[in-house]
Amino acid sequence: MSELKRLHTVTLDKDKCIGCASCIKRCPTEAIRIRNGKASVIYDKCIACGECVRICPSNAKIPSYDKFDVIDAYKYRVALIAPSLYGQFDDVKDINYILTAFKNIGFDFVYEVGIGAELISQVTQRMFAADKLKLPVISTACPAVLELINERFENLRGNLLPLLAPVDVAAKLAREKVAKRGIPSEEVGVFFVSPCPAKVYALKAGKTVKQNYVDGVLSVAEVYMKLVTEIGKLDDSKNLSEMGILGLQWASSGGEAAGAMCEKYLAADGIENVVSILEALENGSLKDVEFIELNACIGGCVGGVLNVENPFVARARIRQMRRKFPQIGTTLAEVGKPTDYFLAEKELERDDQSFGTDRTLAFARLLKIQELYKQLPKIDCGVCGAPSCMAFCEDVVMGRVPNGTTCPIADKERTCDVGEKQ
């Protein structure tokens, strides 16, 4: 799995990296180290949140995604369009122009991920009404948050909403829709235009599906440049949108929670705020809430690092669009699918096995880490190349650094003590 993460999360341009250590302090899972003056990633710990991409002053972190020409491998191409994409465009009064432009850049069909979002909202409402969920329910729409919970807050896994992400639902429905035209499945390529690297990795890894419904994941930024040119050429558009406000509002933080239709909900965005909420939930200090929506990016999906627009501007545009949409574009009754159709198809697997799979060995390693930690200054300065003293201890015990590696600050203090005694 670490190799898959290396290929489909974030890579490093070592020529650009200046070893400034901004990224090691920003990473929420302490997955980055500075070694020999350059950043390096412990991919088993990476949740693909994109924070290192966002914070890097030298643009040395490169998010992974498929290049646009990947669509050429298929005779028929389907574009899956996230609602956050609509907020990237200025002066586009009708989103059907955006959808029509997709057909001019190489796609035969377009399908809105917002439809999948609407259906997930309706299924969530149904499950709440049937009292089938463990409260408080935690949304699983943001794959970076899902990875964070899976690796760092394992005790909360039972609270996760057991449903597919909207993009997986949209991909399933899109494939079925195209199949009804008599087109062989092997000739159809389904491509998601992603606002963030977390969705790239989640779709490549098939985290909650038994088979991948998506064949490629493109970057909003790359596709945007092609769309802008084509939109400017259009005199008219086709009426292609089937989404309502219920799906559109998923583009920004709070939209999913509002769609769940429960009074006691909470929505938080930004990875530091997400961690704070999860810690409060884990220690029992967060109470009297039934649904929790968490997004790693500021503003929600409009804040993804693969987007082109300022997230606050994009969110404002999305809000202004609401008046042009019906409340619900596609209902469960219209698609005729049972609840099981929307359920996650498999349980999450942990990627991070930092201390090994043998519990006895893992416990012994943990004790060694704690003993070593007692000897350190506990100032989390980052001089050693690790983000914290505890992370340094883990690196020593796990053999990630050469034998004999010591804390430079502790060494300096010991040297000073010796000098004073002399």
Indicate where each model-derived feature is located.
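Iron-sulfur cluster-binding cysteine motifs and their immediate structural context
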Residues: 2-14, 18-43, 47, 51-66, ...
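Iron-sulfur-associated redox domains of electron-transfer enzymes in respiratory
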Residues: 64-382, 387-422
